[in-house]
Amino acid sequence: MFAAKYQFLRTVKVTVYLRFVVSNKPEINFKPSVKQLKAWNFLTDSVTNFVGYGGAAYGGKSYLLCYWLVSMSAAYPATAWGLGRKELSVLRKTTLITLFKVLEECRLIPGKHYVYNAQSNIITFANKSVIFLLDTAYQPSDPLYTRFGGLELTGCAVDESSET
């Protein structure tokens, strides 16, 4: 009984953040593990500024950060979010594929609920929120990463941050 109730609470807690107003309602299939839920709570509380989330391969780290970015972009109109990885080419081959899986699982339709511009590396949602795909590699000409200063990001997630 407790396990079933706990699973329901985990699903409901996450569902609250995706309140996109669309003609065919998005469907929430994300049921976080206990570890993912703990990280989700830190990501969505009003106190924590930075969250480091690690673990073994196939632990759902990339999935969690993609789900968080999609949920926040959908829930908060006209906000800007960042999704980074050391090399943009690697991000496109890995994390971006996970992001598209999350968008599909949430029944968000390309061209209707969001648009992906591969030229500018920006995903724009119908509510005017955006996710910038970022190359986070160290550049000797920009040792303090000031190139990100003008983006006015609401939040950012870096996949495989140990590479950066």
Predicted regions and their residues:
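Phosphate/NTP-binding elements of NTP-utilizing enzymes
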Residues: 2-164
